[in-house]
Amino acid sequence: MNQKQQKPTLSGQRFKTRKRDEKERFDPTQFQDCIIQGLTETGTDLEAVAKFLDASGAKLDYRRYAETLFDILVAGGMLAPGGTLADDMTRTDVCVFAAQEDLETMQAFAQVFNKLIRRYKYLEKGFEDEVKKLLLFLKGFSESERNKLAMLTGILLANGTLNASILNSLYNENLVKEGVSAAFAVKLFKSWINEKDINAVAVSLRKVNMDNRLMELFPANKQSVEHFSKYFTEAGLKELSEYVRNQQTIGARKELQKELQEQMSRGDPFKDIILYVKEEMKKNNISEQTVIAIIWSSVMSTVEWNKKEELVAEQAIKHLKQYSPLLAAFTTQGQSELTLLLKIQEYCYDNIHFMKAFQKIVVLFYKAEVLSEEPILKWYKDAHLAKGKSVFLEQMKKFVEWLKNAEEESESEAEEGD
């Protein structure tokens, strides 16, 4: 009987395979030692520092120890909760906090961070988290350290390394209460505006819905435009004060328009609407020119307009005649009348069915004493918009001639009376 043939086997030393899920021990101290040793060798030559950091990324685990890396570059060592150094013995003076407190030095440090994050893109998120943390630790830093961090943050916001959403950390209740947030914001915005300008700052703030929150840098009892304006103007940031004031005005305008439309749709008496608008004008320092534009827009949005050109003019005249007393209450200045004329021109141009209604609307408002001769003549002569001007000027030609003749007649009558 044939014996079953044995299969050949491989013999030799067996190696123990490492478990795939066995993770390397988290050891930030060893990482810290490597970075600090390297920084000690480079000294304060920031070009050399940037090169060292660039090269070290290939050998050290930046992804894992991002927080430790940024702690060292900013504070000189690992930070404990609250902002103190975790180990005061292991630290380096090649860091933001140990550097000179001036804009030029902070600009040089900003370049170090820029180069590092451009080289290792994955550090972007870690760096943002680090800055958010540092802002929450502000009370744990000295005034000089806060100033340096503020300048650096402003520069990094200006060049796009940081996103303006990091400013959320400044709204921390304790930081606000003790005035730390506002003082920090002064230095930050100064360096930010120095790098760019207020318009660029405004765009960045708007992107993260921070444009209307700057007053939250102060406690609730001091959250007024007046207080903000005084504080930042005295600190040399008049452009920021004006920006916030403008933002408040824009917000007030939107609120005014919304309320106006609601009052009109309810059919509130004009005297009540006029009283409300005048109070809002006074409270929010809104000009009559701005208000007349808002009222015009609100009046025109309260009705469903006929799509037929031959019918819309009649509908418009009927509708606007009803609202003439309201409009007349806010055309007490020549400039307001001119603003209204331009708004009418713009509306008639943008809404093609109204192209032939322009002259009829102007005549209606003239008869209703919403508009007077002088602004109409000025509009006709040189103050009109380019939009559809040939059409509208032609429409107005006969009426303007009539106005001029009427004006001449009244002048000659006045002379005869003299």
Curated annotation (Swiss-Prot):
What does the record give as the function of this protein?
Answer: Translation initiation regulator which may repress repeat-associated non-AUG (RAN) initiated translation probably by acting as a competitive inhibitor of eukaryotic translation initiation factor 5 (EIF5) function. Enhances histone H4 gene transcription but does not seem to bind DNA directly.
Q: Give the span(s) annotated as Disordered.
A: 1-25
The yes or no answer to whether the keyword Transcription is present is: yes
Designated gene of the protein = BZW1
- W2 domain location is 246-413
Note the Gene3D superfamilies from the entry. Answer: 1.25.40.180
Q: Coiled coil where?
A: none
The species this protein belongs to is Gallus gallus
Q: Which GO terms describe its cellular component?
A: cytoplasm
Q: Where are the transmembrane segments?
A: none
- Which PROSITE patterns does this UniProt record tie to the protein? W2
UniProt GO BP? regulation of translational initiation
Query: Pfam families this protein is in?
Result: HEAT_5MP1_2, W2
Q: InterPro entries of this UniProt entry?
A: ARM-type_fold (IPR016024), eIF5-mimic_regulator (IPR051245), W2_BZW1/2 (IPR043510), W2_domain (IPR003307)
Superkingdom of source: Eukaryota
Q: Give the protein family.
A: Belongs to the BZW family.
- Residue stretches of biased makeup (Polar residues): 1-14
Q: What is this protein called?
A: eIF5-mimic protein 2
| Assigned keywords, A-Z | Activator, Transcription, Transcription regulation, Translation regulation
